Design a protein with these regions (language model features):
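Polybasic, glycine- and aromatic-enriched phosphate-binding surface used to engage nucleic acids
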Residues: 1-128
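Non-catalytic DNA-recognition/assembly elements of restriction-modification systems
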Residues: 118-175
Length: 175
């Protein structure tokens, strides 16, 4: 009944087109990550690298729902809240943003940027990781720009310490 509509869908890459031609009903770019409780996301088409945590939402009719980003949003899924804020904090920090900006295409930022970064795996027993996660979550909740800036400064210092960067190194990447 919907074959014609499904066969005329646009926006698929070459390898996806071959699958779609064989299986018109295929759902592509869907995997376990799609249904993760938390997603660390950034815009694919962007001139700057800004990350955020997408968390479950309360809907008055449906109860808890998991937002599903569209194809213009790149994300990493996890079911652990602290891990999501840790990764977002690392990616949001001045040292890592500097690396991403130096590497990224001027108009798009795909998931391949993660391949170029050495991000230590989240360890819930590591107080530094938990501190980065807590600071990032605090920054997400802050509405006052002065508070946001103060949290950003603390986050930058925490990530710099994790990577063994000095204050001078941090000042250099901030400028």
């Amino acid at each position: 009944r919907f074959r014609d509509l499904l066969e005329t869908r646009k926006g698929f890459a070459g390898w996806e087109r071959a699958i779609q031609e064989r299986y018109f009903y295929a759902l592509l770019r869907v995997g376990p990550y799609t249904f993760s409780r938390y997603k660390v996301a950034w815009r694919y088409i962007a001139r700057s690298f800004i990350t955020a945590v997408i968390a479950p939402m309360q809907d008055p009719y449906l109860g808890e729902t998991l937002p599903l980003p569209n194809e213009k949003v790149v994300y990493v899924g996890t079911d652990c809240r602290e891990e999501a804020y840790y990764l977002c904090g690392i990616l949001s920090s001045a040292p890592v943003r500097c690396c991403v900006i130096c590497y990224m295409n001027p108009t798009s930022i795909s998931a391949h940027v993660l391949d170029k970064l050495h991000i230590p795996a989240f360890d819930p027993a590591d107080s530094r990781h938990l501190s980065i996660a807590a600071l990032c979550e605090e920054g997400h909740q802050a509405s006052d720009p002065r508070c946001q800036d103060a949290v950003r400064q603390q986050l930058d210092r925490a990530v710099a310490a994790l990577y063994g960067l000095t204050s001078a190194d941090l000042d250099a990447v901030r400028s």
